Every structure is written in C-alpha cells, then in structure tokens.
Amino acid sequence: MQLSTLTALSPLDGRYQDKVTPLRAIFSEFGLMKFRVAVEVRWLQKLASTADITEVPPFSTQANAFLDGIVANFNETDAARIKEIEHTTNHDVKAVEYFLKEKIQSEVELVNVSEFIHFACTSEDINNLSHALMLSTARDEVILPEWQKLINEITRLAEEYKMIPLLSRTHGQPASPSTVGKEMANVVYRLKRQFKQLQNAEILGKINGAVGNYNAHLSAYPNIDWHKFSEEFVTSLGIQWNPYTTQIEPHDYIAEFFDSVVRFNTIIIGFNRDLWGYIALNHFKQRTIAGEIGSSTMPHKVNPIDFENSEGNLGLANTVMTHLGQKLPISRWQRDLTDSTVLRNLGVGLGYCLIAYASTRKGISKLEVNQPHLLEELNQNWEVLAEPIQTLMRRYGIEKPYEKLKELTRGKRVTEQAMLEFIDKLAIPQEEKLRLQKLTPATYIGASVELVEKLS
C-alpha cells in the first residue's frame, strides 16, 4: 500500500494534512535534519573564527559562502542522502556529520578541517539546539500568528455585539445581565495574557559536551574559556543559554512552552463549549452553507460541528503536550534515551492545535446573534432586577432588603408589573423610584459596553 493522505496512519498526515502544512517544514524529520545541519555548520564557523584554535584558520569569504549555501539550500535530496547514510551508521546525528563531510569535498579549504565538524560535541549538543530552533521558529512564524487570528476574530465579536444584552447564567440559572460583546471581551483578555507569556517564554540551549562539563573541549584546548565560548555560540543562534546541564538540556523550558499552549487551548475549549451552549439556547444562529449536510437522517440539522471539532482536537493536543511537559524534564542521572523518541513528537500536539484553531475560526464565521430571542428571554426574567433593587434599598437603610426581595423572587418567575408595584411601595426618594422603574432586564447591563471599549 502506497503512503498517501488516504493511507496515512495519522490524520495529521491524512485527512487534515492541508491544515498542518506550515508545521511540516519545521517538525518533520526533514525539518530536524535541516536544523541539525545549520547547527553543525555554525559550530564549525564559530571554531574557525576563534584565534586560539589555530588548526582551523579563519575561513575565506568563499568558504563561508559555501557553508552558508549548504544551510540555505538544504533540500529533500540532501535529507534523503542523510537518511541513506543513517542506514549504515544507525545513528542519525553521525549521519549528518558524514553528510557534511561529503558535501564539502569540492572545497579544499574545508576538507582540510573536516574533522572539526562536530568537534567536541555530543549528539545532544546538536539536537537540543535544533529542537530549540524548531520551537522558536514554530512559535514566531506559526503559533503566535494563529493565536493572533483567533484573538482578532473574538475581538471582532466583542466589538460588534458590545451593546446586545444577554441574560447571564451562573450555575445554569438566570443571573444579572451582561452583553454578548462583554462575554467575548472576557475571553479576549485571557487569551492576550497567554499570548504574552508564550511570546516572552525563554527558549534555552546548551553546547557543553557529553556530561555538561566541557571535558572533551578542555582536553584539546585547555586555555580557552569554553563556558564563555558556549554562551557566545548559543546566543548567536537567537537562543538563551543554559549554563548548567548534564548531557541533555533538561527541557524545563519545553514544559513551560507547552504548558503555555495548553493554557491557551483550555481557554478556547471553554469558549467552544460556551458557544455550543449559546447555539443550543438559540442565542446564536448558524449561517447555513449550500451543499452542507448536518445529519445523514435528519435533514433539518445544522450542527455546531466546528466548535465540536475544535474541542476534540484541542483535547488531543493538550494530552500530547501535557505528556511532553511531564516527561521531558525527567532523565536518569546524566541522561537516558527516553526523551529521544518523545522529542520526535514536538510537532504533533501543535498540529492538532492548528486544526482546532481553524475550526474555531470557521465556527465563528457562521455565527449570527439571535437578538429577538435574547430580548425575549430577558423580558421573561424580571426577577434579575432583584439585585439592583435590594442594593438601592441597602443604601437608603431599608430593613432586611435582601430577605424581602428573596421572598418576592426566589424560585419564581416575576412579572414586570410585580416589580413595578414592589418599587412603588419602597420608602426611597421619588427620583430613585423613577430610576428603578425605568430599569429593565435589557438595560441592566452595568458597565458592559464601556468595558468592551476599554479592552484595547
């Protein structure tokens, strides 16, 4: 059976492959090879730029350009060659080293220093920096832009519906009204916090040898400050330096990275469920799309499938990323290999994220507020005005205001007329009575509109 989108084991590479395309060049095995090649090349160039390493003279402009070209022009043919070499070495990082030694054969200047490719490095020196570059690239070029799209869409809902009143529900029961826009603004604010946290998250790397102590480095060049050298190299890649590690970078930052994504996703899961519920309550209508079918047997159905799809995929994403966050920071003694196979799944959870984010945006695009229904529902729940009435009664010193409103309203459907009669009997200033009598469930929305306008 030939591998295709129909025969792929994972739906990420099958049914949903078009939705995860931006991640493929980053987190595929091709992507990992590409970043490994880049790290190996930059390490060789760093050695050549160091005067104390006389065995690697400074590279000519031509040699540096040749090396830069290997990185910039890395392609699938190159990746296939690395894979071919690995069939012999049974070691993926060593295959990259041998590939580079092959690649430089036409440049005598580089051939003369070929044994300094991968000099003093353990495989994890190359791998951890590659993984850091993968996550940094994915964050800046894919994840944060996707988050911004979602935030923009929900912000649009907040602004568009900021004045449309909504009967709130606490514990599923009628509560003080809000507006549709204000409920969207609550979500936007939460998402923006997570955006900033991921944007500012540290992405760490190390290059310090087999157990983190520069043993091999110092055996060859004891007079070089390898600790400083390591910092210079790691930061030159745009990565923050971790000065204290075992053989592996301990991956705490990866746990922090994915924890941030999980928090963002959890907010979106709640958002999906709330919109699902609002649709069920007829607060929102869904625009139909010609040709779409909601049920194989019930022709009338227009299901909230996009929010359901998003919720399901975010659950998968969070499960994968939570495991990464819990497993990766644990490694026996100076290292064990359990992280290796797990790290090959860095992009899996993020792939499910992309599917989910697209589904939520699609669901939002179909939404249309059912304002007549919202107003009707508010008009059937005059008891929500018990709160402002008893609060004003407290101001004017009326005895047992809460208890009197509780007796009138608790567990009852109260009419407008009953509320007006209750207000009329209150011993409060006439202007306050008039203010309360003008109040309706639809206008008792507090500062909802102003809060939306202050969101930015």
Enumerate the predicted regions with their spans.
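Glycine-rich anion/phosphate-binding loop at the beta-strand->alpha-helix junction
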Residues: Q194, Q240, T246-R335
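A helix-coil-helix interface module used to build multimeric assemblies
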Residues: Q2-H217, Y221-E232, G294, F307, ...
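Glycine-rich cofactor/substrate-binding loops
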Residues: M1-K34, Q62, I85-E86, N90, ...
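Short amphipathic alpha-helical segments with heptad-repeat character
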Residues: S136-L144, Q148, A185-V188, K192, ...
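A structural signal for small-residue-enriched, beta-sheet-centric alpha/beta enzyme cores
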Residues: S123, L218-Y221, S236, W241-I248, ...
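Proline-centered turn/helix-capping motifs that create local helix->coil transitions or kinks
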Residues: Q105-L110, Q199-E202, A280-H283, N318-T322, ...
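Generic, well-ordered alpha-helical scaffold segments in large soluble proteins
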Residues: R42-L47, F99, K103, A138, ...
